[in-house]
Amino acid sequence: MTKLRLKSKDEIKKIKASASLLALTLLEVERNIVPGISTKELDLIAYDFIIKNRAKPAFKGYRGFKGTICASVNEEVIHGIPGKRKLADGDIVSIDCGVILDGFYSDMAKTFKVGNVDSSIDKLLEVTNASLYKGIAEMKVGNRILNISKAIEDYIKPFGFGIVREYTGHGVGFELHEEPSVPNYYAPFFKNIRIQEGMVLAIEPMVNLRGHKVSIKSDGWTVFASDLSYSAHFEHTVAVVDGLPLILSEV
C-alpha cells in the first residue's frame, strides 16, 4: 500500500471530478439492476460508461482482476467477479467501482436491492449505509482515524450485525490504495494517525447480517460471510477540506 500523501485543494478538485464520474457510473448501473440481468452485463454497462467519459476503470487489471466492477451478491461481501450469474428477486448486490480520470483515483460502493427483500435485509442495508455517514462525520481535523472506526462500530453494534474485520477502508487519490488503513471497528493495534487537512480516504463499512467472520472462494477473489448470511457494503471517497469532511463521490 502506497504511503500517506496529503492532497492540495487543486488535487482534491481533480479527485472530485473522478469521484463525480464514478457516482454517475453507479447511477447508470443502478438503473439496470433488475431480476434477470447478469453481473457481467452490469460490468459492461459500467465499462462502457467510464470509457465513453474518457476515463479508465481503476479495478480492471488491478492485481489481475478482470472486472470493471466488483459485483458481490447476497452472502458475498466484496471482490465478487462479474460473470454469468443472473440476479433474482430478493437478492442484494454490492457494486464496488473505481475510476481513474486524468490520473486521479476514486473509489465507491453501494449495495442495491433486487426487487423485494426481507425486512431484516432492508434493515441491514439501512444500518450499514447510515454507519458510513457516522464515520464520515468524524473525519475532521483534531480527530484520529480510530474516531471514524469507533463511530461506525458504535452505530452498528446495537443492531447485532457482524462487522467485517479483515478488510478496511484506505487512503485514495494518487493510487487506488494508499495509507492509512481505516478499520470499521475500534482496533487499537492499527496506526491511529491524526486526521489532517488534505487527507483523502475511502471509508467503507462491510457488515454481515449475523457473524463477522469471512472466507474466500476458490476463485481467489470473492470474499463471503462464513455463515452465509447476507452482507452489505457502502463506500465513499471523502476529503478533509478546511478541517471538515467533504464527500467527493456524490452528485
UniProtKB/Swiss-Prot annotation:
InterPro entries: Creatinase/aminopeptidase-like (IPR036005), Pept_M24 (IPR000994), Pept_M24_MAP (IPR001714), Pept_M24A_MAP1 (IPR002467)
GO biological process assignments: proteolysis
GO molecular function: initiator methionyl aminopeptidase activity; metal ion binding; metalloaminopeptidase activity
Pfam families named among the record's database cross-references: Peptidase_M24
Residues holding substrate: H79, H177
Keyword hit for Protease: yes
Cofactors demanded by this protein: Co(2+); Zn(2+); Mn(2+); Fe(2+)
Leading EC class: hydrolase
Catalytic activity: Release of N-terminal amino acids, preferentially methionine, from peptides and arylamides
Binding note for cofactor: Binds 2 divalent metal cations per subunit. Has a high-affinity and a low affinity metal-binding site. The true nature of the physiological cofactor is under debate. The enzyme is active with cobalt, zinc, manganese or divalent iron ions. Most likely, methionine aminopeptidases function as mononuclear Fe(2+)-metalloproteases under physiological conditions, and the catalytically relevant metal-binding site has been assigned to the histidine-containing high-affinity site.
Keywords: Aminopeptidase, Hydrolase, Metal-binding, Protease
GO cellular component: cytosol
E.C. designation(s): 3.4.11.18
Keyword rRNA-binding annotated: no
UniProt binding sites for a divalent metal cation 2: D107, H170, E204, E235
Role played: Removes the N-terminal methionine from nascent proteins. The N-terminal methionine is often cleaved when the second residue in the primary sequence is small and uncharged (Met-Ala-, Cys, Gly, Pro, Ser, Thr, or Val). Requires deformylation of the N(alpha)-formylated initiator methionine before it can be hydrolyzed.
Matches recorded under NCBIfam families: met_pdase_I
Self-association state and partner proteins as the record states: Monomer.
Database matches in HAMAP family: MetAP_1 (MF_01974)
Family affiliation: Belongs to the peptidase M24A family. Methionine aminopeptidase type 1 subfamily.
Protein name according to UniProt: Methionine aminopeptidase
